[in-house]
């Protein structure tokens, strides 16, 4: 397995329309920068939390047994965690490498810590988020990112940096995308245009190990309105609906269509979840993929079992076998558009 996604917080300081964080009100710590984007709707507030240091240390210890890399997000902006610098230090004591994905709004505050940490392998900046910001703060944040890139080139030339524009094809973002590319060109002498993007050519070298990564926008998967959560069973063979017993684990139920066996309700497709990666939410729940922010395919809890045991659970095995056979056996997977990228 390549990576474990560890959601150190589900707090974010932006309310992007394309992200589940932006579809409900969120709280941010007092010292964080407030969002300049108003909430997109009036959905009820859901808990926003920060992973404890004890849980984080357990997560990286378990991650080191199955993977080489970690991310610090599922939802949320990881650099907002009050213990972000402390977590970097803890990570240095393991063989794990960090691929950090950030919206970049706080990069000026954490840049020194990142560049001094040998465990940081790659930094991904979601610059497409700025298309929804007023021009002035967007340009300020972008300049902070470009300044970081220049510093990294000087002191950490081994550090990979991706400047992401994952909104290609979204006409409302074109103006920002052109502005962003022009600013990158001014900073590094590159000449990359929007028209250069195609589904098989998404990454463009800017300079050194700095890349522009373009892609289309995707919709986050969600549970089907026809699904319901099974009651927790005492053993994987107890299923009141007569369905495939391997789809539930001993202690955790999953979402399945009402009255249907998951093994009979499949759709064509595959995913890299449980092959290249797995995710741990801020409360310790282990989920099948990096997009399952609400724990709809909860495989277990890292405080109850080892990560290796959870990955070997009946539910994980069932899903993994399905992916190998190009079967999406879970409604959450069937509602996911991200997996369509794998065939491009």
Where are these regions (language model features)?
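Residue-level marker of regulatory loop/turn positions in helix-turn-helix DNA-binding domains and
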Residues: 1, 48, 263, 272, ...
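Conserved alpha-helical substructure of the radical SAM core
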Residues: 1-122, 132-143
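Flexible mid-to-C-terminal extensions adjoining Fe-S/redox cofactors in radical SAM and related proteins
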Residues: 1-5, 22, 31-39, 285-344
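Processing junctions and N-termini across compartments
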Residues: 6, 10-13, 265, 327-330
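Cys/His/Pro-rich metal-binding microdomains
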Residues: 13, 17-20, 272, 334-337
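Generic structural signal for secondary-structure transition and capping sites
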Residues: 24, 68, 96, 276, ...
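Radical SAM enzyme [4Fe-4S]-AdoMet core and its adjacent flexible, acidic
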Residues: 28-33, 94, 117-305, 310
């Amino acid at each position: 397995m390549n990576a474990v996604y560890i959601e150190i917080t589900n707090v974010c300081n932006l309310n992007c329309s394309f992200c589940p964080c932006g579809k409900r009100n969120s709280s941010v710590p007092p010292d964080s920068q407030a969002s300049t984007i108003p909430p997109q709707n009036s959905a009820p507030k859901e808990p926003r939390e920060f992973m404890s240091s004890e849980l984080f240390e357990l997560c990286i210890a378990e991650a080191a047994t199955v993977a080489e890399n970690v991310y610090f997000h599922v939802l949320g902006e990881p650099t907002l965690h009050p213990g972000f610098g402390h977590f970097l230090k803890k990570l240095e004591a393991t063989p794990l490498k960090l691929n950090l994905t950030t919206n970049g709004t706080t990069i000026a505050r954490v840049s020194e810590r990142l560049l001094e940490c040998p465990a940081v392998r790659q930094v991904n900046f979601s610059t497409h988020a700025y298309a929804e910001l007023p021009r002035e703060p967007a340009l300020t944040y972008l300049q902070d990112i470009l300044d970081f890139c220049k510093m990294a080139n000087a002191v950490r030339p081994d550090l990979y940096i991706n400047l992401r524009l994952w909104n290609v094809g979204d006409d409302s973002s074109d103006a920002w995308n052109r502005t962003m590319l022009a600013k990158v060109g001014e900073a590094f002498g590159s000449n990359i245009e929007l028209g250069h993007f195609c589904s098989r050519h998404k990454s463009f070298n800017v300079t050194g190990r700095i890349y522009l990564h373009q892609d289309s926008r995707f919709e986050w998967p969600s549970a089907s309105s026809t699904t319901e959560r099974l009651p927790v069973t005492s053993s994987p063979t107890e299923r009141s609906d007569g369905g495939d017993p391997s789809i539930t684990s001993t202690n955790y139920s999953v979402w399945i269509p009402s009255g249907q066996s998951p093994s009979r309700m499949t759709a064509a497709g595959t995913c890299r979840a449980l092959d290249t990666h797995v995710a741990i939410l801020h409360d310790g729940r282990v989920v099948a993929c990096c997009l399952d922010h609400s724990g709809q395919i909860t495989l277990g809890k890292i405080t109850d079992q080892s990560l290796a045991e959870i990955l070997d659970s009946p539910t994980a095995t069932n899903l993994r076998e399905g992916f190998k056979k190009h079967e999406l056996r879970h409604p959450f997977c069937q509602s996911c558009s991200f997996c369509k990228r794998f065939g491009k």
